[in-house]
């Protein structure tokens, strides 16, 4: 299942990109994540709580500062990206997500984007 959502953020693109590229921020805008640690330059370890169960996994995570884009993928087929573009005086943040099992809902994805927007706008 594929999802794509876009949200305007009233902050400069570099500020939005900085927030999403810092993996330690993930638990601040993805409520299911409880901890994130970088294991090497392109991989992160993630602790999360889904459907009442604690889960631990490692995912690839790359950040392209010039393109203001992050990408991630897990062995389970879960993958996605976020892209930040200039949008007038602010930014346009797009999130794309692909899952094999349809676990994520459009509401959850929209809530994640909204949490990022609130986080970044409160800090600029």
Regions found by a protein language model. Give the residues of each.
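Hydrophobic pocket/interface hotspot
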Residues: 16-20, 26, 44-46, 61, ...
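Short, charged/polar surface micro-motifs in flexible loops or helix N-caps
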Residues: 42, 50-55, 62-68
């Amino acid at each position: 299942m594929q999802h794509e959502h876009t949200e305007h953020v009233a902050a400069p693109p570099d500020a939005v990109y900085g927030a999403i590229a810092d993996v330690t921020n993930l638990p601040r805008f993805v409520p299911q994540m409880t901890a994130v640690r970088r294991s090497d330059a392109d991989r992160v370890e993630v602790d999360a709580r889904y459907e009442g169960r604690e889960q631990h996994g490692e995912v690839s995570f790359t950040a392209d500062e010039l393109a203001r884009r992050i990408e991630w993928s897990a062995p389970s087929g879960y993958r996605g990206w976020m892209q930040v573009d200039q949008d007038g005086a602010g930014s346009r943040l797009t999130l794309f997500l692909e899952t094999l099992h349809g676990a994520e809902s459009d509401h959850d994805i929209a809530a994640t984007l909204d949490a990022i927007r609130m986080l970044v706008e409160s800090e600029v």
